Amino acid sequence: MPQHTELVVLLDDDGETIGTAPKATVHTRDTALHLAFSCHVFDAQGRILVTRRAIGKLTWPGVWTNSFCGHPAPDEDMREAVHRRAEQELGLELESVELVLPDFRYRATDAAGVVENEICPVFRAVAASPVDPRPEEVGEYQWVDPEQLIPAVAHTPWAFSPWLTLQLPLLYPEHAAHSGLAETAAAAAAVPAA
């Protein structure tokens, strides 16, 4: 049976689609700008689901991050991609999927030199089923109060993904300002991306 090649959508600096490329060829030291998304999932108590990326992941293995991320397929509706990836990565059904940071964009280099270079709209959603993570995607997970997550990221940013570090001050500006996270994120954003 032929193996399915996952494609990512390549973008120009204005965010316009310029083509596609196999996902396996995109995340390198010279990563092209491409389309992705992040999602922050909440439970009925208002806690956020954070996940620790599996050790086998190509980028940022073993670090804590937001609930999940992914790449929409060419011509796939972004909300459909969010639902698809929640099921693939976490065995999770979602409700109330809402776009909260439509213009989020970042570039970061991990310890192995692999670059993420994404226009990455950020969504929030509510869990509609129990979490059943796939071990090849998620090493572990926790439900945490956002007010506890923010100082943890501010004090140990190296333990978290750079996109989470950059997203939290935008999602929770009132808490980030008091925790030092705004300064941590500003410093991370100021690091040249090589």
UniProtKB/Swiss-Prot annotation:
Positions bound to Mn(2+): H27, H34, H71, E116, E118
A Pfam family that the UniProt record links to this protein: NUDIX
Domain Nudix hydrolase: 32-166
Coiled-coil zones: none
Active site: C69, E118
Keyword Magnesium in annotation: yes
Pathway(s) where this gene product acts: Isoprenoid biosynthesis; dimethylallyl diphosphate biosynthesis; dimethylallyl diphosphate from isopentenyl diphosphate: step 1/1
Cofactor: Mg(2+); Mn(2+)
Protein purpose: Catalyzes the 1,3-allylic rearrangement of the homoallylic substrate isopentenyl (IPP) to its highly electrophilic allylic isomer, dimethylallyl diphosphate (DMAPP).
Protein family membership: Belongs to the IPP isomerase type 1 family.
UniProt-recorded name of the protein: Isopentenyl-diphosphate Delta-isomerase
Species name: Clavibacter michiganensis subsp. michiganensis (strain NCPPB 382)
Gene: idi
